[in-house]
Amino acid sequence: MKPALVVYFSRTGYTQRVAEHIAHAAGADCEPIKERSARTGFLGYWRSAREALRKSAIEIEPASANPRDYALVVLGTPVWAGNMSSPMRAYIARHKLDFGRIALFCTQGGSGGEKVLRTMADFCGRSPVATVCLNDSEIDRGLHGVKLQAFMAAFAERKAA
């Protein structure tokens, strides 16, 4: 069994930056969730908010990595209108029975991240070994490193226990 897989969706790049940081620091595989249509511009923003509010699970491309092959799956999503992104909702719906241990993170421009992390855990049907919510402004200023170190230490600690 492989140690860890980081799976994320990112529309603006914030969640991608965090996911790649975690994967690099933890020596984990990293896989973006790919969807069938783009979310660019105002219409992409509007569509994202509408799907999040409706809690839609949309069509996504098949994953190349099987979460069942990993001891830990780290899931990352942006906060959209106070909810997890619809691509992440679709990924969890498709793979939640394949998860062993999970860790969760979210990025946000505003608020709602803690609620999103609880919703993700409930939707996965298990308690995460670690969670963290990062503000886009923290990421822009490079202030997210300390929170990520604590996040990764928490899931590494749970692995040793």
Where are these regions (language model features)?
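Residue-level "edge-of-site" marker
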Residues: 34-36, 80, 105, 133-134
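Redox-cofactor binding/interface segments in oxidoreductases and associated redox assembly factors
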Residues: 75-76, 104
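Short, conserved loop/helix-junction motifs that constitute active-site signature segments
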Residues: 67, 93-100, 123-126
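Short, glycine-/small-residue-rich phosphate/pyrophosphate-handling segment
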Residues: 103-143
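A generic structural signal for alpha->beta connector loops
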Residues: 1-3, 27, 99, 125-128
